């Protein structure tokens, strides 16, 4: 029976990926469709992806598939053809190609079965996730941005919004998608006469959010097809103004794609203009925060003097100090301080 999970250490896999000479292409895609047996589907896809040397993060559930992956450039078209042939529901599926890609986004393949491909917290049996808002293409997005009756709602987390967003887009203050959904409904109650335009990184969150808004009585709901990634790509291809400002946060080693030259965020340590996220180098912290090059040198990649001092201790002493601490890494939130998460790079679908 073939091995259906990775058995090589992360360090070895990362070193192997960094030594590769062939360029890689970072791709994201999702599809809401019924999967009768997610476990069997997962195992079959794992073999397909492994044969094509695909790395990345893939989630499957009865409601569909959500993937962020890295594919050797020479295998991209073969991957596309085999994915389309895998299930009729996937034929012609839109693949979002990364905008700002060094090919070093992933170095291991992780494929998991979950209850949902997006953790939404919705338990309403009458909710119809297929009753989504209308798609908007790049030119239509720009027209909506100039429409005084349209409100753009950013369905990403606060640390994503902080480094980049559409002009005048509303932030729904939250640390997870499941927190955002009820807040979006609450915040928009007085604006049911407005045109609601929802967006996210690649489309998966705003598509479900648009259905949730319609379920809660909002009738004028749109969402951007393919999210920020596809919007920026199509706008550039069509010679349209790109109205997204700043950087598009992404959930892989790159931590961001440059969309415009503007830097709208600031270093969390000194306040200098900066939009580069990093994780604190102290293994007992791993705070996700924004750090400028000057502070990175001053604090040796750490978020504070305390972490800087601790990271310089002998490994055994560091382990002793970490013993008994709350597990999980953290996210910097300017209004709420440090927040727990379970990954160094947070998962947008949690």
Curated annotation (Swiss-Prot):
Q: Which SUPFAM superfamilies match?
A: Rhodanese/Cell cycle control phosphatase (SSF52821)
Indicate the residues that form the catalytic site: 200
> Among its keywords, does the record have Oxidoreductase?
yes
Record keywords, A-Z: Oxidoreductase, tRNA processing
Q: Which HAMAP family does this UniProt record tie to the protein?
A: TrhO (MF_00469)
Return the PANTHER family for the record.
TRNA URIDINE(34) HYDROXYLASE, UPF0176 PROTEIN YCEA
Q: What is the protein name for this chain?
A: tRNA uridine(34) hydroxylase
The organism encoding this protein is Escherichia coli O17:K52:H18 (strain UMN026 / ExPEC)
